Amino acid sequence: MTDKTSLSYKDAGVDIDAGNALVDRIKGVVKKTRRPEVMGGLGGFGALCALPQKYREPVLVSGTDGVGTKLRLAMDLKRHDAIGIDLVAMCVNDLVVQGAEPLFFLDYYATGKLDVDTAASVINGIAEGCLQSGCALVGGETAEMPGMYHGEDYDVAGFCVGVVEKSEIIDGSRVAEGDVLIALGSSGPHSNGYSLVRKIIDVSGCDPQTTLLEGKPLADHLLEPTRIYVKSVLELIENIDVHAIAHLTGGGFWENIPRVLPENTQAVINESSWQWPAIFTWLQTAGNVSRHEMYRTFNCGVGMVIALSAPEADKALALLNEKGENAWKIGIIKASDSEQRVVIE
């Protein structure tokens, strides 16, 4: 019998030691996100979390998301620090529009070859996003899968669970004619429309690292992390009777605002109430993108739209601006049986 080489998992492309080194690197930042309801620490087969005692009839709200092809841009530019914030933002912002307080977050990080520095940078960003939104990072999965991803390319997904009092769920059912719509300003394209962004960069031939826009590289505008609205919106809900909140993600104005409108209502958006941030003007010009397509693909400077009764509008604006948001009246709700649920004029 001939001697055979003894193979290991590492020979197959999976470095368990690198995975353990990553866990050691992130323990500290993960611990900072801990909430009092969390039971146990990292390393268990599952994460345990009790419900906060203040809820009388708690309803759990869950969500999952990724960051789309913004990830490709981040990998190409070797800038991974904000992607984790994006990941958390896309999940927790979807929860808070229903009135839910985010409780805990889990992440999935998959790669062809684990680079500990890159992965730690991403997870540090996830922890920062959890701190910004007040939820605990209770666990995750790091999968090194040679042959599934090219080189050190990676993908991330996030999962979040929150809680809301049953009687305080925000579902849009109370939106009515005469309601005022308030906008919350975005930090940029957030995490949507990046396949079109990358196509525009390709067609225009620009270098995002050397092309300047308002005095800073285009890359800085494009990789600005998604704004997390959780704490501001929860404060608003505590003090104002909010009828609906729309998170402007994929589908932009045309598809997201109708998701919270009852039948026979229409959102009328006043386009003159705000000026697009420079990055959106650049994208439209460089890509010769139509106005309709811009509002369908991008948030165009508006991260959320909130519906509430007209007498509450000024108080809501004062509260939101005091919390550091850029908030303004962007439109109204009208009665309409038109199939066009959103009008921008």
UniProtKB/Swiss-Prot annotation:
It is an enzyme of class 6 (ligase). GO terms for biological process: 'de novo' IMP biosynthetic process; adenine biosynthetic process. GO terms for molecular function: ATP binding; phosphoribosylamine-glycine ligase activity; phosphoribosylformylglycinamidine cyclo-ligase activity. InterPro entries: PurM-like_C_dom, PurM-like_C_sf, PurM-like_N, PurM-like_N_sf, PurM_cligase. It catalyses: 2-formamido-N(1)-(5-O-phospho-beta-D-ribosyl)acetamidine + ATP = 5-amino-1-(5-phospho-beta-D-ribosyl)imidazole + ADP + phosphate + H(+). It comes from the Bacteria. Pathway: Purine metabolism; IMP biosynthesis via de novo pathway; 5-amino-1-(5-phospho-D-ribosyl)imidazole from N(2)-formyl-N(1)-(5-phospho-D-ribosyl)glycinamide: step 2/2. It is found in: Cytoplasm. Its EC number is 6.3.3.1. The keyword Coiled coil does not apply. Keywords: ATP-binding, Cytoplasm, Ligase, Nucleotide-binding, Purine biosynthesis. It holds the Pfam family AIRS. GO terms for cellular component: cytosol. PANTHER family: TRIFUNCTIONAL PURINE BIOSYNTHETIC PROTEIN ADENOSINE-3, TRIFUNCTIONAL PURINE BIOSYNTHETIC PROTEIN ADENOSINE-3-RELATED. Belongs to the AIR synthase family. HAMAP family: AIRS. This is Phosphoribosylformylglycinamidine cyclo-ligase.
